[in-house]
Amino acid sequence: AGSSEAGSSAAEATGDKVITVGASPSPHAEILEAAKDALKAEGYELKVVEYTDYVQPNLALESKSLDANYFQHLPYLENFNKERGTKLVSVAAIHYEPFGIYAGKSKDLKNLPDGAKIAVPNDVTNEARALLLLADQGLITLKDNTDINATKQDIVENPHKIEIVEVEAAQVPRSLQDVDFGVVNGNFAIASGLKVADALATEAADSVAAKTYANIVVVREGDENSEKTQALVKALTTAEIKQFIENKYQGAVVPIF
């Protein structure tokens, strides 16, 4: 009996050294893979479980199949908690995927033709980000205190009489041939072969959008200061990971730590 008891306590000790994290395949799982060695050096094995949807990784975390997840931003998490009654919290912001303004029929943002058509995503969250970016570039003026809930109704000045064309987010890259400019989500830009380096303008790292839509590491409430959580956050916020993100994604994914 003595030997098997020793065996089981050793197994428990190693079992406790596995950190299981749910993530979207790109860039989240790729960034986690890059942090594996740093965690190994701390005595932890990192197990990454990939999800292609945005519901299961939160449910799996709530039901304790995962120790953490990394795929979402805070507004999504807060809404999820409200709708599902889950108690999940953010412990670190790792990166954001900047929106960019891309050239369509026109190439020069500074000399905008009057009546220019600009395609933006048509869902609330993404349209607000697009409008904030256009406002940052001085193309339109939004009401004071307009935030991540901005809509077309919040435009107070539009000197160039820009026509905002609302298109499903994934379709904006395709619509570039029909409009003067398009405002494209980082992930859809990458998927459609647009290079962020070619964007005429992108969200600044200190913009409201970058801070709001930073992708976060999430754990169950009460686990914020657990050893596993601290080890995971430490491994994801090193100079090495920062460099990995910058080199691999060339501006399409930007570290925010």
How should these model regions be labeled?
Residues 62-72, 116, 139, 160-163, ...:
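Alpha-to-beta junction loops
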Residues 1-18:
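Short, low-complexity disordered leader/linker segments with a strong preference
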Residues 98-109, 213-226:
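A bilobed periplasmic-binding-protein/Venus flytrap-type ligand-binding module shared by bacterial periplasmic
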Residues 91-140, 242-243:
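A conserved helix-loop-strand patch within extracytoplasmic ligand-binding domains
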Residues 14-26, 44-50, 117-118:
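Short, well-ordered beta-strand elements
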Residues 48-59, 147-174:
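Short helix-initiation/N-cap motifs at beta->coil->alpha
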Residues 79-91, 106, 178, 183, ...:
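Ligand-binding "clamshell"
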Residues 125-149, 230-257:
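Ligand-binding clefts/hinges and TM-proximal coupling segments of bilobed small-molecule sensing domains
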